[in-house]
């Protein structure tokens, strides 16, 4: 996969200036589609027949086996497509295919939370070629999706505002093309790590941009430059809301060795894909998990990821934080501006959802050198222990830290404190936490107190005060 992304950028053939197709209109190789710095080769997309865009419909009635549908009244009427439901198209990227497990898995998670028409768009006929050619073929894919959306509107009175197009990699730009052709009337487009090569820095006409739908949200997971870092995704903001989980460049869990990747539980193919492009693929895995974790991917507005990791962007502002992924459209300020940036951390494996807390500990007892940890207990669950501070522990001093729990503990009922000495201390000092304040990302605070002190490695339970 890696050589195809890089070397195929250098391959291509000189084509004619324009080609036209009855249903989809004309396609040119003039600027900005070709002949610009980011895409110097003059290449036309392949024909609709060669790209062979297919629409694979899953619904709540057929969650496991798709029905292939077309922009045809009898095809739609003879399927499980329901006009009183939202329709979510999912478009894969380079070398991928519409029958790949991840697309169906998105649909299956959707069926857990809503009744929906879930259409996986297969264009493997145009994706399994050199990258430069595939980057042109997405124009055909976008045109086919736009034609399908317009057909639903004309034949069934189905509003484009009820359409959501989700695209990964090159599929994100295909979604943008569909949106451009429908004049921005599509309700929502979600770009899952939109492809960088041939798109970063190009005019809006070529790539995904906020004007392509009423609402455009983007997840960036592989934003390092393609040269020399082989980052496949864009770092450029291209939506109303742009999320940069873990900074948007290196995703946790993506540095496993090749053997552990290939013998992954997902199988040899999925494991090999993960090794070749793990960061790039994380975007659709985050989206899949977000569907069943409606509050587990809060994105914080922040100047940069470095500022975020310095604990300077918590809690959420008065307008709240958007949720990265499926529920981003619930954010009240989603279209207040374009290029709004948000940062968050995720887990290193599914379930990727995390819940961020700020914990402030006021110490009591003796002055010692060591480190302190706190665990949270709530009405929804309990967290593991997280380190709050390491260094000199002084009575009446307060130390704060933020951490991302893999459990949403809900309303807190108690906290537990423990400390460890960094050196052997024969005096057996005792340290306690006179007060611990826990703050959630929405600014809700819980206060806990204890008059006790404990020796190292002994748990101290604090109750509400």
Curated annotation (Swiss-Prot):
Protein name: Pancreatic triacylglycerol lipase
Taxonomy of the source species: Eukaryota, Metazoa, Chordata, Craniata, Vertebrata
Active site: 169 (nucleophile), 193 (charge relay system), 280 (charge relay system)
Function according to Swiss-Prot or TrEMBL: Plays an important role in fat metabolism. It preferentially splits the esters of long-chain fatty acids at positions 1 and 3, producing mainly 2-monoacylglycerol and free fatty acids, and shows considerably higher activity against insoluble emulsified substrates than against soluble ones.
Entry's Gene Ontology BP terms: cholesterol homeostasis; fatty acid biosynthetic process; high-density lipoprotein particle remodeling; intestinal cholesterol absorption; lipid metabolic process; positive regulation of triglyceride lipase activity; triglyceride catabolic process
Highest taxon of the lineage: Eukaryota
Keywords, ordered alphabetically: Calcium, Disease variant, Disulfide bond, Glycoprotein, Hydrolase, Lipid degradation, Lipid metabolism, Metal-binding, Secreted, Signal
Single GO term (MF): phospholipase A1 activity
């Amino acid at each position: 996969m890696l050589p195809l992304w890089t070397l195929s950028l250098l391959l291509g053939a000189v084509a004619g200036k324009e080609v036209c197709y009855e249903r989809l209109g004309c396609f040119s190789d003039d600027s900005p589609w070709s002949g610009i710095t980011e895409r110097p080769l003059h290449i036309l997309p392949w024909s609709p027949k060669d790209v062979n865009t297919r629409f694979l419909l899953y619904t709540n009635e057929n969650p496991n086996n798709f029905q292939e549908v077309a922009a045809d009244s009898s095809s739609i009427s003879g399927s499980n497509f329901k006009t009183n439901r939202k329709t979510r198209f999912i478009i894969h990227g380079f070398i991928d295919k519409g029958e790949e497990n991840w697309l169906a898995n998105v649909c299956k998670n959707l069926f857990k939370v809503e009744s929906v028409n879930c259409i996986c768009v297969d264009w493997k006929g145009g994706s399994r070629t050199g990258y430069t050619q595939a980057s042109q073929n997405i124009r055909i894919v976008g045109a086919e999706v736009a034609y399908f959306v317009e057909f639903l509107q004309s034949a069934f009175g189905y509003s484009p505002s009820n359409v959501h197009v989700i695209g990964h990699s090159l599929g994100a730009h295909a979604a943008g093309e569909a949106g451009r052709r429908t004049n921005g009337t599509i309700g929502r487009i979600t770009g899952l790590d939109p492809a960088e090569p041939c798109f970063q820095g190009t005019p809006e006409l070529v790539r995904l941009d906020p004007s392509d739908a009423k609402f455009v949200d983007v997840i960036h997971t592989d934003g390092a430059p393609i040269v020399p870092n082989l980052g496949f995704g864009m770092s450029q903001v291209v939506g109303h809301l742009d999320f940069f989980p873990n900074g948007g460049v290196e995703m946790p869990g993506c540095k496993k060795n090749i053997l552990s990747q290939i013998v992954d539980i997902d199988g040899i193919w999925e494991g090999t894909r993960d090794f070749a492009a793990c960061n790039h693929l994380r975007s659709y895995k985050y989206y899949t998990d977000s569907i069943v974790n409606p509050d587990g991917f809060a994105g914080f507005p922040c100047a940069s990821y470095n500022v975020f990791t310095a604990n300077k962007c918590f809690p959420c502002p008065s307008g709240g934080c958007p949720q990265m992924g499926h529920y981003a459209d619930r954010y009240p300020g989603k279209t207040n501006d374009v290029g709004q940036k948000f940062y968050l951390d995720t887990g290193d494996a599914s379930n990727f959802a995390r819940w961020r807390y700020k914990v402030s500990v006021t110490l009591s007892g003796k002055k010692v050198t060591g480190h302190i940890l706190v665990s949270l207990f709530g009405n929804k669950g309990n967290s593991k222990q997280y380190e709050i501070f390491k260094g000199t522990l002084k009575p009446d001093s307060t130390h704060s830290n933020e951490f991302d729990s893999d459990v949403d503990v809900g309303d807190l009922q108690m906290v537990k404190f423990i400390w460890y000495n960094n050196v052997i201390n024969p005096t057996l000092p005792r340290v306690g936490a006179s007060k611990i304040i826990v703050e959630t990302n929405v600014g809700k605070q819980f206060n806990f107190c204890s008059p006790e002190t404990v020796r190292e490695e002994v748990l101290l339970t604090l109750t509400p005060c």
